[in-house]
Amino acid sequence: MTLRISGKSVSVGEALRGRVSDRTEEVLRKYFDGNYSGHITLSKDGFGFRTDCALHLDSGITLEADSNAPDAYASADQALVMIEKRLKRYKSRLKDRSARKAHVASAALAAMDATSYVLEAPGEGEDEDEVTGYSPVIIAEATTSLKQLSVSEAVMELDLSGAPCLVFQHGSSGRVNIIYRRADGNVGWVDPPGGKADGKAGG
């Protein structure tokens, strides 16, 4: 179990580091009894402080949250409150998932590998009316593993992570699916080919 707590243009003293570490342990142990790792970064943001929190549970779930506040302690507390609220929402399902570690391990072995890229965004020229001949430049590349999940499990992971979208391998069909947050607050679901798209996310 490794939790890194660091500062970006901020000195993180032992008192703050201890407070954040203890609070993280308290939040996670309420709803999860397995191991975890992660990184919590505190940084200066204007006249206040920002906390970026990413925690990885050994069940395969990633929790992410960020918060801004005038005080570094308050900023960290608020980020962990966000994570606690998400964990509380899925308390029973998280415990069930933790009890199925063997199933999770076998699913990980069968997971599909995919290559992910970061592309350079087109420039924002003030005097340009049209972008022509744009050829995106790959600035980063990595291999990621697409989890085998039901749609309901994918929605849970999307909500817990706070991410805008999630790409996964459908546990029943084996197809690559996408769920994403819609502007109306609902979750869109894309299931190609010939599947449901933008429908109600079910099991």
Curated annotation (Swiss-Prot):
InterPro entries: HPF/YfiA_ribosome-assoc, HPF_long/plastid, RHF-like, RHF/RaiA, Ribosom_S30AE_C, Ribosom_S30AE_C_sf
CDD domains: RaiA (cd00552)
Broad class of the protein's primary localization: cytoplasm
Subcellular location: Cytoplasm
Keywords: Cytoplasm, Translation regulation
Source taxon at top rank: Bacteria
Gene Ontology biological process terms, A to Z: negative regulation of translational elongation
GO CC list: cytosolic small ribosomal subunit
Molecular function GO terms recorded: ribosomal small subunit binding
Family in the record: Belongs to the HPF/YfiA ribosome-associated protein family. Long HPF subfamily.
Function: Required for dimerization of active 70S ribosomes into 100S ribosomes in stationary phase; 100S ribosomes are translationally inactive and sometimes present during exponential growth.
Quaternary data: Interacts with 100S ribosomes.
Protein name as annotated: Ribosome hibernation promotion factor
Taxonomic placement: Bacteria, Pseudomonadati, Pseudomonadota, Alphaproteobacteria, Hyphomicrobiales
